[in-house]
């Protein structure tokens, strides 16, 4: 994993998380920590280990991490502005994923669909594991009749990072209702779309888990490794929040899973020399 040039300016944990929560690729640092499990960390997307990370905030009570700064430089700018504390003063962060999303939303309010698509695409390029930006992009592709890119975006909206944001019911509905285009008719997610509702918890049996397992297994087989690892982590995250009896019935042990996933992601979570 590529470390930022100014890495010496933060007090860094030396071990990258394996998952489930915090997710794989999250590296905790101590500046601006609020305690009680709320702190910041560097985060590398799956497939972007050779790029500098963004900065995410771990929000313990919600069980998520949230993209907060587009780079460590931007975090440090904010941190210094707030007298080296967690303060209320804000900075401009043009490359943050939410900034592009908001610009896209503004364009939609002005009925400028093509410009909105540009900003939504920029948001996915800025950070590609957020369900919302892919769904915003998908919706506009649908609006202009671009079915191929609509379906590609829906796939990315579902196989996003659920430790950051869980796909909305609108995403699931769009997935289930689509008729796959020829180029995507054999995609593992689209082939299994009718069997997924992504409802978890409070059930004695839940077929979603077996379907998801089938999907990420096939993604591994066809060489889409980054999406496979992301979806496998999502599977484990949902299973992690289930009751212990549910886990036992489904032969899931978080420690066993972490051990195996650590091996799968070993090359990914190896840091460049500090």
Predicted regions mapped to residue ranges:
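A surface-exposed partner-binding patch
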Residues: 1-47, 107, 114, 125-134, ...
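Short, solvent-exposed loop/turn segments at secondary-structure junctions
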Residues: 33-36, 48-49, 60-64, 80, ...
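Compact, glycine/acidic-enriched structural inserts
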Residues: 51-88
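A structural "flexibility-hinge" signal
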Residues: 54-57, 100, 111
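Inter-repeat boundary and helix-capping residues of tandem alpha-helical solenoids
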Residues: 86, 93-94, 127
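Alpha-helical tetratricopeptide repeat
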Residues: 94-108, 135
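Low-complexity, intrinsically disordered
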Residues: 111-114, 118-119
């Amino acid at each position: 994993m590529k470390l930022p040039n100014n890495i010496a300016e933060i007090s860094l944990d030396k071990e990258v998380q394996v998952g489930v929560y915090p997710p794989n690729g999250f590296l905790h640092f101590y500046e601006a920590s609020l305690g009680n499990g709320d702190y910041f960390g560097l985060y590398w997307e799956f497939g972007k280990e050779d790029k500098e990370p963004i900065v995410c905030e771990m929000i313990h009570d919600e069980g998520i991490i949230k993209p907060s700064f587009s780079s460590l430089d931007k975090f440090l700018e904010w941190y210094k502005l707030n007298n080296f504390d967690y303060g209320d003063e804000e900075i401009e962060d043009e490359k943050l994923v939410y900034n592009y999303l908001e610009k896209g939303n503004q364009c939609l309010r002005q009925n400028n669909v093509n410009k909105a698509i540009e900003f939504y695409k920029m948001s996915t390029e800025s950070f590609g594991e957020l369900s919302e930006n892919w769904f915003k992009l998908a919706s506009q592709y649908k609006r202009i009749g671009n079915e191929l890119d609509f379906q590609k975006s829906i796939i990315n909206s579902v196989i996003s990072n659920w430790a950051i944001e869980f796909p909305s019911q609108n995403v699931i509905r769009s997935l289930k209702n689509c008729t796959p285009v020829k180029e995507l008719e054999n995609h593992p997610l689209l082939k299994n779309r009718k069997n997924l509702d992504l409802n978890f918890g409070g059930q004695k049996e839940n077929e979603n888990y077996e379907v998801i397992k089938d999907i990420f297994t096939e993604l591994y087989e066809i060489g889409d490794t980054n999406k496979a690892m992301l979806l496998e982590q999502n599977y484990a995250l949902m299973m992690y929040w289930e009751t212990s009896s549910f886990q036992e019935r489904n032969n899931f042990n978080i420690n066993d899973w972490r051990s195996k996933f650590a091996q799968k992601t070993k090359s990914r979570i190896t840091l460049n020399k500090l």
